Amino acid sequence: MKLVHKDIEKDNAGQVTLIPDEAEDMWHTYNLLQVGDSLRASTIRKVQTESSTGSVGSSRVRTTLTLCVETIDFDSQACQLRVKGTNIQENQYVKMGAYHTIELELNRKFTLAKKVWDSVVLDRIEQACDPAQKADVAAVVMQEGLANLVLVTPAMTLLRAKVEVTIPRKRKGSCTQHDKALERFYEAVMQGILRHFNFDVVKCILVASPGFVKDQFISYLFKEAVRQDCKLLLENRSKFMVVHSSSGHKYSLKEVLCDPAVTARLSDTKAAGEVKALEDFYKMLQQEPDRAFYGLAHVERASEALAIDILLISDTLFRHQDVATRGRYVRLVDNVKENGGTVRIFSSLHVSGEQLNQLSGVAAILRFPIADVSEPEENSSSDED
């Protein structure tokens, strides 16, 4: 993401102009947008035209519209973002107040205006515009006949390909059908790696499976690389790391990222940091439950006592449409930072973020124990989106 212009007033109102230059930037933009914001961007509009003879036709024209945002739709698989709202600036093709849907496009600038830019949103822009934040981890999570090829970016886990091949069972005295199917499977996974992983960006490729599938695949991969003289694989052999997983399903990625050897190698990545923070929280919950709180009301009380060492909070909560509730989450983040605590904002598109959402989306590891906190009168579930 490129920041073209930023104009924020002292009262925190203002606008920014950004250019999304890769698919992940659409996810960042989705997290910036809120109902009531003003979005100005280039778009295509179908307009009716009347010729001199009176015949009516229609054509598609490119124009720039400014919408008051009403609905925001993000497709996480295609990384497409559509924003629907009403036109709030005069335009030769679209009447004031008319509805339109803008699909934001890569490499086309847009301007977003808000009445209040809070610290969480401004941090998100800083993160999105940091060139160091790229998809530098890839993973192949596999078992016999199934492989998920995944990119782990700082903001999301992207499933790039799923390989499924039926593997017949070994028969007594003959393994031919089984072995041929297994070879077809390994070949398909190899082609998937070459097609979907950018070796110029990826620093590490995790190959994970139960049993010996991962080892057999790596052996096949580099034998084939030598046979086919595939320099791309041979030159990047050191980037491959073999680790254990309980299955070939995508959810096993969490346990892969928890592996101490993996954690050490990926110590500088945001995704690994999120996984470790959640693991530390669960350990604390088991060993010292008075130092592990979750749920907004309980975590707020810990924050008031200046007790929070690490705050774990899901980005889902900052998309809450109720301004007052969203404000509580923003104040919580600001208070923890002001009092020397660490804030980790989890992406709901990471496995760890999905897990945190099951714990209400907000949790904290405390500096010191706080005795049993009585249940708040309000139902904390009403605080969640």
Curated annotation (Swiss-Prot):
One of its GO terms (cellular component) is cytoplasm. GO terms for molecular function: metal ion binding; ribosome binding. Its cofactor is a divalent metal cation. Transmembrane segments: none annotated. Signal peptide: none annotated. One of its GO terms (biological process) is nonfunctional rRNA decay. Keywords: Cell cycle, Cell division, Cytoplasm, Metal-binding. Its main location: cytoplasm. It is found in: Cytoplasm. It comes from the Eukaryota. The keyword Ion transport does not apply. It holds the Pfam family eRF1_2. SUPFAM superfamilies: Dom34/Pelota N-terminal domain-like (SSF159065), L30e-like (SSF55315), Translational machinery components (SSF53137). Component of the Pelota-HBS1L complex, also named Dom34-Hbs1 complex, composed of PELO and HBS1L. Belongs to the eukaryotic release factor 1 family. Pelota subfamily. Component of the Pelota-HBS1L complex, a complex that recognizes stalled ribosomes and triggers the No-Go Decay (NGD) pathway. In the Pelota-HBS1L complex, PELO recognizes ribosomes stalled at the 3' end of an mRNA and engages stalled ribosomes by destabilizing mRNA in the mRNA channel. Following mRNA extraction from stalled ribosomes by the SKI complex, the Pelota-HBS1L complex promotes recruitment of ABCE1, which drives the disassembly of stalled ribosomes, followed by degradation of damaged mRNAs as part of the NGD pathway. This is Protein pelota homolog. It comes from Danio rerio.
